[in-house]
Amino acid sequence: MENKICLGCLAIDKKLRNNYCPKCIKELFNGTVPNPLTFDKVEFTKKRAELSARMSISGVQDKISLTFEKKDLIPTATNGRYILKPIPSGDGHIQNEKDIAVNEHLSMLISKNIFKIPTASCGLIKFSDGELAYITKRFDYDEFSNLKYDQEDFAGVMGITPITHGENYKYDACSYLDCAKIIKKYVASSIISQEDFFKRIILNYLICNGDAHIKNFSLYSKADSIEYFLTPNYDLLNTRFHINEKYGDMAIDLLDDYTSTYEAYGYYTYDDFKTFAKYIDLPQIRFNKIMKFIEDSYQEVEILIDKSFLSPKAKEFYKESYKDRMKRLRLK
C-alpha cells in the first residue's frame, strides 16, 4: 500500500481516511471524517459575497466560515466552527500566491509541533476540483457548551484604533515590549505567558513573518473562567516570500528604542532579543534554553519544510530565510 501524507499534520500514514490521519480527524474535526469540499474556488467567491455582510470573522484575506452538515463542511453566516482560506486570486500585489495556503499551514505546524506553542488546529483541505485550501478550527468556542469565549485582540485591549493612531495603527502604535506589558497586566499566569510570548515573537522573526501586528495577538477568557489567557497562535506566514517588504524585518518594533547593536547592523540580532528577554523578566536560564532549542531544532524544521506542499522554489526560500535569521541570532 502506498504511503500518503496527511493534510493535517503532514505525517506519512498508510491508513488515511479522506486524506487525514486518525489523530487529525479527532483533533481538527472532532472525530468526523470530512468529505472533500463540495464547491470550488469560483463558488467560494460567490458564497463569500453572499455571506460577507453577516460573517463575524475579521481580516483582509479572503475567507469564509464553515460548519459541519453531516460529513460535509458547508459555508455559514453564523456559528461557524472553521475558517477556510483559499489560494488568493492574483492581483499583482502578492507574489507566489499559489504557495500562500500551504505556507500558512507549514508555519502553523512549526509553531505547534516543533516550538510547542499553543496553536490553532489547522490543515489543508481540497476543493471539489482538487485545489488545496487552508482550514483552521476556531478556538473561541467551548466544544462542549458551544458558548463563545470573550476574546479581544491587543489593539482592542489597548484602545488603539485608526482614529487614535492613524491608518497604520496595527503596526505603528506600539512595540512588542508594550504587548508584553499588557500580558503582565491582564494574565494571571504572566510568568509562563511571557515565555510563551517571547517564543512567538522569535518564531515570527525566524519564519520572516512581517505581519505579526497587534491584531494578530489576543487575550481570551474561557466560558467558565474570569481569568484571561493568551489565545493560541494564529495567522502565521513567511510573508517575505510573497511581499517585498520595505519597512524592516518585523511587523512592529521589538523594543521602545533601538539598541546600539540594531543601529550598527540595521536588523535585530541576538543582543536585541536578549535585551527584550531581560525587559519582560524572562530568566537568563530560560532565554539560553530557548536559543539552544532553536539551534538544535533546525533539522526538524527542515524536514517539515521538505514534507510540506510548498513548491520547490518556496521550500528553498523558506529554508534559506530561516537560516539567515538564525545567523543573525548567532545560531548557525
Name these PLM-found stretches.
Residues 1-40:
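TRNA-binding/sensing appendages of the translation machinery
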Residues 28-48, 81-85, 109-111, 200-213, ...:
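Short, charge-rich amphipathic segments
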Residues 43-166:
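Conserved ATP-binding subdomain of kinase catalytic cores across diverse folds
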Residues 37, 75-85, 170-178:
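Active-site-adjacent bridging/hinge elements
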Residues 99-115, 172-245:
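Conserved kinase catalytic-core segment
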Residues 1-8, 96-99, 112-114, 123-129, ...:
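C-terminal catalytic region of ATP-dependent kinase domains
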Residues 128, 133-206, 263, 271-275, ...:
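ATP-dependent phospho-/nucleotidyl transfer catalytic cores
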Residues 37-58, 118-119, 137-147, 208-222, ...:
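Charged, low-complexity, helix/coiled-coil-prone segments
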